[in-house]
Amino acid sequence: MTGASEILDVVCILLRAQERHMTTKAAFAPEEWKVVLEAPPTAGMIVITAAHGGTFRETIAMTKAYTEARAQHGESELLDEIVAAKPKVDHTLYHSPEEFRDQGLAHLRDAVALLESKATAEERDDYRRFVLTLANEVAAAHREHGQSVSPTEAEALEEITAALGAAGS
């Protein structure tokens, strides 16, 4: 009986070690890492361009979401590296808000696909929550027509949620 107990202890230790596996920047090629880094601010910019207003407050909300990410989204080395990098997105490369939205949503899907292949399930969930929290904080940062989130921002949030594969999150 002692042998089975020892084997069970070893299995538990191995499972705990596997749970603590953390993905880092080193797991990604430079172009892949750029995609993962740029997805959160892209989500924020999708919301900003959907509303056509309040850019200053919404940008401050995006910065605040980065600052608070570590405390809100658990222990994630991957998220720590993303937050520390503070990436920027050049939305001027696009000819219209619609083009930016379409390309941005594709960018979010690409980032999630990369994380699906390289990160743990917990890290993927943390990343999705971070991106959605950021997008929601940006949407709520500027009241429009008496609403904390405008209909166009709500639509953008739904599209972001779908692109992240985070239905109901």
Identify the function of each model-found stretch.
Residues 6-8:
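Generic low-complexity, intrinsically disordered segments
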Residues 10-169:
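Small-residue-enriched hydrophobic alpha-helices in membranes
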